[in-house]
């Protein structure tokens, strides 16, 4: 299936609001979520604000397109790494400097979101990806 130039691949994750699919475009690998036309109309301002966020600690929104059936496709960067809730307790997080780097990254990401007028609403360790380089990236911005 192809939506707005994005080839839909395998399901990456299934959340409360539905699946996230892996997708590819000329810009590389990304994740795509679909929302109903009603949800899209309600969340369009949030997505527009999200495009203004420029922080390496917030997953980037690449595109928002309408599918042929009227649903909204939200395309965000794919962030390699593991959720913080999986990382907690691992040897990689034991050094104090590493923990500090993660907390500072979360704070910077939240500051960027709030600066754009976005309230996350569900900031949990499961919604923070720790990249292999130890950078914290806030995800799950799509919905309120």
State each model region's role.
Residues 108-118:
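Protein kinase catalytic-loop region centered on the HRD/HxD motif
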Residues 84-94:
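AlphaC helix of the protein kinase catalytic domain
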Residues 102-103:
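Activation segment signature within eukaryotic-like protein kinase domains
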Residues 38-52:
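AlphaC helix of the eukaryotic protein kinase fold
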Residues 17-42:
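ATP-binding glycine-rich loop module of kinase domains
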Residues 9-15:
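Protein kinase glycine-rich loop
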Residues 60-72:
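Short beta-strand micro-motifs within the conserved protein kinase catalytic domain, predominantly
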Residues 69-83:
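Conserved short submotifs of the Hanks-type protein kinase catalytic core
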